[in-house]
């Protein structure tokens, strides 16, 4: 995400240089280091890769000690909530009328707070503060807020689908941005013409976000004025936003970063932290704001939906021409981080988050890859891997279809189209671990299939996955029975941590293909609980086999790499089992039954 503040590069670089030279104590003075001298961590010869210690908070986690923002306790702590109109934050809305007397009649009510800083994009909220968290629901009901909403911005799911429909955009001509623009003959005889659509999706962290704010009396106006406890992915950004909002020097705000119960890009903006700070200032006491599950769905930002069309020509046993066009919404250049005038300028450059993963990792001589990003009335932003998950799923689905047209083995087809030794290595490793030639056989009751995918994340980290699936002929129920993943992120400093990240990516991939779709209705997100947004459960998760490639290359990151492999492997296995390429996600039992019936 673009950072509007100067990054503390010299101190970080100075510290890393000192550590690399063996200095582990004492005082360092930050010094300027030329950008050209900065480099990634270089592995030392003979480094003990498996000697990493267990995470320092492991014992505290398994014994339930207070580590998360919601665990914060302070003397005199009060509890707050900011009420908002039940529509998207992209729509202008504000409280029009409320019954303050009825709310204050509750003995647990401390205050009803109106303040312009309670605005999140177009949504202006109304704050309430109570003595106990259980009283907040009661006070909210008594307040009976009536909302003023911009009627001209009403929308339903169909409006979102129409705005990003890739075929509509292609009929209008070339898309906004091109990642690769080789000339493709207008009379190209396409072997494959594939349309795929990926829906809106939520972060759905197990821990809804929380923050506690405490304003401190400071007579000399130089010390810490505001302390905030939060589960944030960027405490410096949080501090700087609060400093701007309250016209304070950044040095007068202290943000204590607590452990996060699920971030995935969703804890980057200043939301609940600002709400807590405004309410705490209004009542002159520390205030904790804890979002509900419904607020997490409706007020957090989501992975944008995307619509894709891929055309490919297969000739002489190879792909000779490739055209991938996609339409989506913004991930980095959103209203949450920049004003409207800046969004317009940013649109000229193109949102790199939308494009991530759209460039295929294989060798095809003639390619056109283009995209457009449309402003949507739903709140979109970074989701694990940004655009890499949906984009690579589509690329690898098309790659698999091309292999079928050529009558080629999917593994051999991929190896035939790459000269990248590291990509070939993870493909071969995943295939070997899964015993690729030993394909699962279908029987009278169950269809079985196997799929493989390889990918490169941000040009530096590699992953390949193999998936096995079973499909019940009579019910259409799909079960992933095994997932293998080979992962190359250079030198692995914390093997257990990398395995855990890879396993998490694979579970997200499972949800992406078979479970997750955020419903939209009445101008906003319609999910209030996990009943409305099903996630993979423990019983849905197959055995996960992760192989970390032993490498002495510099470490390149592992938090999102396997997102380029897991979903495509599952989708390709489903295609192998059923003979049907499902073009709209998620794939549910009813979709499978209908497809099998049509095919029969």
Predicted feature locations:
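Cofactor-binding beta-sheet edge motifs in enzyme active sites
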Residues: 1-600
């Amino acid at each position: 995400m673009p950072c509007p503040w100067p990054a503390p590069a010299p101190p970080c670089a100075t510290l890393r240089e000192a550590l690399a030279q063996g200095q582990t104590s004492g005082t360092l003075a930050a010094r300027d280091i030329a950008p050209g001298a900065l480099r990634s961590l270089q592995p030392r010869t003979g480094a003990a890769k498996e000697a990493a210690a267990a995470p320092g908070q492991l014992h505290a986690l398994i014994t339930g000690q207070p580590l998360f923002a919601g665990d914060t306790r302070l003397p005199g702590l009060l509890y707050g909530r900011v009420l908002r109109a039940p529509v998207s934050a992209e729509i202008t809305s504000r409280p029009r009328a409320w019954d303050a007397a009825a709310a204050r009649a509750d003995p647990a009510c401390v205050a009803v707070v109106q303040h312009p800083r309670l605005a999140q994009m177009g949504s202006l909220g109304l704050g309430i503060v109570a003595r106990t968290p259980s009283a907040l629901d009661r006070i909210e009901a008594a307040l009976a807020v009536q909302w003023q909403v911009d009627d001209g911005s009403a929308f339903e799911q169909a409006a979102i689908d129409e705005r990003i429909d890739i075929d509509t955009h292609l009929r209008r001509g070339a898309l906004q941005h091109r990642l690769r623009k080789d000339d493709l003959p207008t009379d190209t005889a396409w072997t494959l013409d594939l349309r795929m659509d990926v829906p809106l999706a939520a972060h759905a962290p197990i821990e809804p976000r929380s923050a506690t704010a405490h304003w401190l009396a400071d007579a000399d106006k130089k010390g810490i004025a505001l302390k905030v406890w939060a589960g944030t992915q960027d405490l410096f950004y949080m501090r700087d936003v609060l400093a701007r909002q309250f016209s304070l020097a950044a040095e007068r705000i202290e943000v204590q970063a607590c452990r996060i119960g699920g971030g995935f890009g969703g804890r980057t903006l200043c939301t609940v932290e600002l709400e807590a700070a405004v309410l705490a200032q209004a009542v002159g006491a520390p205030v904790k704001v804890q979002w509900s599950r419904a607020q997490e769905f409706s007020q957090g930002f989501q992975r944008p939906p995307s619509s894709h069309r891929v055309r490919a020509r297969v000739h002489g046993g190879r792909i000779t021409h490739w055209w991938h066009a996609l339409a989506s919404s913004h991930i980095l250049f959103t209203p949450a981080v920049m004003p409207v005038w800046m969004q317009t300028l940013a649109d000229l450059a193109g949102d790199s988050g939308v494009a991530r993963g759209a460039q295929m990792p294989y060798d095809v001589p003639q390619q056109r890859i283009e995209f457009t990003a449309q402003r949507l009335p739903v709140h979109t932003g970074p989701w694990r891997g940004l655009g890499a998950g949906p984009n690579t799923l589509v690329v690898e689905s098309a790659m698999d279809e091309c292999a079928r047209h050529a009558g080629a083995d999917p593994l051999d087809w991929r190896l035939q189209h790459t000269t990248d030794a590291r990509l070939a290595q993870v493909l071969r490793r995943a295939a070997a671990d899964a015993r690729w030639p030993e394909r699962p056989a279908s029987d009278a009751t169950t269809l079985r299939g196997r799929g493989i995918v390889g990918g490169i994340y941000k040009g530096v980290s590699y992953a390949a996955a193999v998936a096995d699936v079973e499909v019940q002929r009579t019910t259409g129920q799909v079960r992933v029975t095994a997932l293998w993943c080979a992962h190359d992120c250079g030198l692995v400093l914390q093997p257990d941590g990398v395995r855990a990240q890879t396993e998490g990516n694979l579970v997200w991939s499972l949800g992406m293909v078979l479970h997750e779709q955020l419903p939209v209705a009445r101008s906003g997100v319609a999910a209030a609980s996990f009943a409305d947004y099903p996630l993979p459960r423990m019983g849905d998760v197959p055995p996960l086999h992760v192989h970390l490639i032993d490498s002495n290359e510099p470490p390149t990151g592992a938090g999102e790499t396997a997102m380029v492999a897991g979903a495509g492997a599952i989708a390709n296995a489903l295609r192998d089992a059923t003979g049907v390429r499902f073009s709209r996600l998620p794939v549910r039992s009813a979709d499978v039954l209908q497809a099998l019936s049509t095919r029969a």
